[in-house]
């Protein structure tokens, strides 16, 4: 049993714990959570979730721990990652989900505390490697890669269909837009923020802002370095987002051939990572979907032989958290 610690018990940290419990109950175990809020608050927010409803299992508090279905998870509250006693808790892999410690040097503090590996749940800088499950996860090498970024939820949505299309037809260049649900890095009401657009009320505006998802493609699909760019539109929905990208192909194709290539990729190479949806659905229909990317077939088409538009849905909280759990499991299998 590989032992996990979670640093930062916010939206992603809590969903990662649920994903581990649901997907890997016999191979992964979360044994400690480090968060500055008290154990009672964290247990309450874990059990009662506005987006996903009440947790079906048993959640109780016991001194400095909370018990989930009888399993004790130590509650820690250290502000400095270097002070967290991961070694005392026997933690093998730390899930760094605060959104604060997103560089290699910052995340390496967890290694100093006794952990063997760190997975950053965000785009990172100076990390050992960025991995997207289904795309480049096989590049992981246990002796070389200790600080691993799971990229962003948007990169995890964008990369699978891009990989399938690039392998089939070759991509010359592309532009993407993610229509993204609001997150905690926005303001509920107008309030100062270093990004003046994110300073505006999240529930009342469509907010254009940056995304590193397109540029991060080059980290997981090196062939596309410098060939993709894009931006984000934050919208007043609580979860589930959608990527819309246009790309110029190197070879000609048809709408039906493009759709079939994506269907085949979802059934074979990217099974469980990418799916194709034939129905006429809307965002809330994908809430709780564990796929990284769900291609909307009706809105995926070709213009004049070599310009393609692809639309793909993703639950930016749950789908991404499932990939974090998958990555931890994969790393454990390949060696720490």
Question: Which functions belong to the PLM regions below?
Answer:
Residues 50-51, 64, 71, 89, ...:
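Short capping/connector residues at structural and topological boundaries
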Residues 1-199, 302, 326, 333-335:
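N-terminal Rossmann-like NAD(P) cofactor-binding subdomain of oxidoreductases
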Residues 230, 242-336:
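C-terminal active-site/capping subdomain that shapes the small-molecule cofactor and substrate pocket
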Residues 77-80, 224, 290-297:
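A general structural signal for short secondary-structure boundary/capping elements
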Residues 66, 131-133, 147, 189, ...:
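Short clusters of hydrophobic/aromatic residues that line enzyme substrate/ligand-binding pockets
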Residues 98-99, 153, 209, 250, ...:
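Structured loop/turn residues at secondary-structure junctions
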Residues 3, 7, 11-16, 25-26, ...:
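Active-site-lining helix/loop region of Rossmann-like oxidoreductase modules
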């Amino acid at each position: 049993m590989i032992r996990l610690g979670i640093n930062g018990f916010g939206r992603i940290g809590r969903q990662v714990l649920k994903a581990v419990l649901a997907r890997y109950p016999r191979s992964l175990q979360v044994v400690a959570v480090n968060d500055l809020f008290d154990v009672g608050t964290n247990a309450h927010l874990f059990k009662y979730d506005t987006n996903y409803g009440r947790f079906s299992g048993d959640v109780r508090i016991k001194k400095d721990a909370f018990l989930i279905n009888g399993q004790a998870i130590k509650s820690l509250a250290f502000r400095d990652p270097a002070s967290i006693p991961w070694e005392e808790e026997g933690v093998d892999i730390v899930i760094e989900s605060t959104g604060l410690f997103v560089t290699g040097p910052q995340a390496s503090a967890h290694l100093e505390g006794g952990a063997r590996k760190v997975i950053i749940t965000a785009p990172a800088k100076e990390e050992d490697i960025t991995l997207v499950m289904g795309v480049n996860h096989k590049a992981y090498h246990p002796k070389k890669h200790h600080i691993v970024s799971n990229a962003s939820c948007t990169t995890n949505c964008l990369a699978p269909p891009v990989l399938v299309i690039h392998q089939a037809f070759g991509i010359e260049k592309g532009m993407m837009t993610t229509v993204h649900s609001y997150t905690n890095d926005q303001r509920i009401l107008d309030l100062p923020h270093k990004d003046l657009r994110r300073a505006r009320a999240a529930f009342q505006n469509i907010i254009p802002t940056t995304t590193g998802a397109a540029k991060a493609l080059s980290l997981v699909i090196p062939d596309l370095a410098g060939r993709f760019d894009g931006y984000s539109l934050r919208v007043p929905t609580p979860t589930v987002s959608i990527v819309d990208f246009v790309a110029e192909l190197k070879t000609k194709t048809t709408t039906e051939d493009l759709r079939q290539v994506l269907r085949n990729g979802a059934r074979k190479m990217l099974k469980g990572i990418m799916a194709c949806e034939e129905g006429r659905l809307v965002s809330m229909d994908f809430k709780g979907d564990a796929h990284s990317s769900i291609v909307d077939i009706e809105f995926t088409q070709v213009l004049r032989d070599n310009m393609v538009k692809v639309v793909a849905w993703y639950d930016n909280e749950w789908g991404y958290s499932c990939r974090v759990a998958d990555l931890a499991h994969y790393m454990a299998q390949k060696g720490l």
